[in-house]
Swiss-Prot record:
Protein name: Bifunctional protein HldE
Gene: hldE
EC number: 2.7.1.167, 2.7.7.70
Active site: residue positions: 264
Region Ribokinase, residue ranges: 1-318
Source organism of the structure: Shigella flexneri
Length: 477
């Protein structure tokens, strides 16, 4: 199944925060200065790129979404360079000019793909009247699908709590890339996106994934957040939401050259995807793929729709992820040549919960590769009734494909996956619940081929039906 990109062109996002100009001086170096033990760089190329909150807006615009940017600048060449660069990529700028301060500028000197030094030109904007920014936010709220607050602790978000309240009253989700350890400032936000270091600076060192989840859920409760996304570098990302199983997504980066601005890309793609009408789980899936692209570039960078589509398709192209039936058969054949044991299971997986995650993790431990076959929407409706599925097939497959335990995800249209299983013939067929092995669809075919069939227990107390009933009861209450 081909994963469809969000309709970014219908998404409107406002970014408010610390804007800055990133300057890059490039050149060769072949000698050490006689004045001090430092390399001499002969500068032959100079580049200027929007940074900080401006880079977030650039990332949103590069996807084809409508991006508006509000921030504080000086009245200087750097501000003019920022405005021109952003206008060239269709970012609508509405800066508040502060004549007493310079525009924040960061100068990096690079040679042979290595950053040698960074020079910062800045004065904090603390104490600047926030009212002009509040007015700009209020004027835009009726026409945007998400508000991003990009905090680099330079003073533009000194009144962040008022900004959150403005958006909440308008029903607009607020996404924040936090800075520092005072998360009380961000109380009531829809989503925070700290990296692991920022997260641990607040909750303490986490030795295990379980500790990340436990402390993250407490942080959500303490600060009345709707969700938390912890970006974990080479370990991917972890999405935490109240009442839902944690979603751990492995990194998609092939090579890492520069992590500059990667957090900007993540929150930019998250916001654009949500504003386009997609779910938070889908937004994290696309943001994770985009992060894998941008860290493979040098310097502050953005991701285009073509790059994002290629990254999303990348797992299937390399033999993993969401697949068609024919692609899966080729992937399984390649796995068998490598001597790998293939495990297969199936289900609706409508609202993914902890029971599903534990079950799939246990199934994966029984072999080297795990296939999850998913009922199509029509198949689910016939099986579960007209009110199901809650989540359409594409969303269900995307979420399953993001799980570390799952190697391949494929769909089937029939009431049972018997035909599909007969075509794949896994080494081990597993099913959760209280079935007898001979009752499981495809068991006869697997046995006839010399394979095994096994029934695994589900985690007690976890049920999609019960979750739906509770949601319905809460709505009535």
């Amino acid at each position: 199944m081909k994963v469809t990109l969000p309709e970014f062109e219908r998404a409107g996002v406002m970014v408010v925060g610390d804007v800055m100009l990133d300057r890059y001086w490039y050149g060769p170096t072949s000698r050490i200065s006689p004045e001090a033990p430092v390399p001499v760089v002969k500068v032959n190329t100079i580049e200027e790129r929007p940074g900080g909150a401006a880079n977030v807006a650039m990332n949103i615009a590069s996807l084809g979404a409508n991006a508006r940017l509000v921030g504080l600048t000086g009245i200087d060449d750097a501000a003019r360079a920022l405005s021109k660069s952003l206008a060239d990529v269709n970012v609508k700028c509405d800066f508040v000019s502060v004549p007493t301060h310079p525009t924040i500028t960061k100068l990096r000197v690079l040679s042979r793909n290595q950053q040698l030094i960074r020079l910062d030109f800045e004065e904090g904007f603390e104490g600047v009247d926030p009212q002009p920014m509040h007015e700009r936010i209020n004027q835009a709220l009726s026409s945007i699908g998400a508000l991003v607050l990009s905090d680099y602790a330079k003073g533009a978000l000194a009144s962040v709590q008022q900004m959150i309240q403005l958006a909440r009253k308008a029903g607009v989700p607020v996404l924040i890339d936090p800075k520092g350890t005072d998360f009380e400032r961000y109380r009531g936000a829809t989503l925070l996106t700290p990296n692991l270091s920022e997260f641990e600076a607040v909750v303490g060192k986490c030795k295990t994934e379980e500790e990340i989840v436990e402390r993250g859920m407490k942080l959500i409760a303490d600060y009345e957040l709707s969700a938390l996304l912890v970006t974990r570098s080479e370990q991917g990302m972890s999405l935490l939401q109240p009442g839902k199983a944690p979603l751990h997504m492995p990194t998609q980066a092939q090579e890492v050259y520069d992590v500059t601005g990667a957090g900007d890309t993540v929150i930019g793609v998250l916001a654009a995807t949500l504003a386009a009408g997609n779910s938070l789980e889908e937004a994290c899936f696309f943001a994770n793929a985009a992060a894998g692209v941008v860290v493979g570039k040098l310097g502050t960078s953005t991701v285009s729709p073509i790059e994002l589509e290629n990254a999303v398709r990348g797992r299937a192209d390399t033999g993993f992820g969401v697949m068609t039936e024919e692609e899966l058969k080729l992937a399984v054949a390649a796995a068998r040549k490598r001597g790998e044991k293939v495990v297969m299971t199936n289900g609706v997986f409508d609202i993914l919960h902890a029971g599903h995650v534990f079950y799939l993790a246990n199934a994966r431990k029984l072999g080297d590769r795990l296939i999850v076959a998913v009922n199509s929407d029509a198949s689910t409706k016939r099986l579960k009734g007209d009110s199901r599925p809650v989540n359409p097939l594409e969303q269900r497959m995307i979420v399953l494909g993001a799980l570390e335990a799952v190697d391949w995800v494929v769909s089937f249209e029939e009431d049972t996956p018997q035909r599909l299983i007969a075509g794949i013939l896994p080494d081990l067929l597993v099913k959760g619940g209280d079935y007898k092995p001979e009752e499981i669809a495809g068991s006869k075919e697997v046995w006839a081929n010399g394979g095994e069939v096994l029934v695994l227990n589900f985690e007690d107390g976890c049920s999609t039906t019960n979750i739906i009933k509770k949601i319905q009861q809460d709505k009535k209450g």
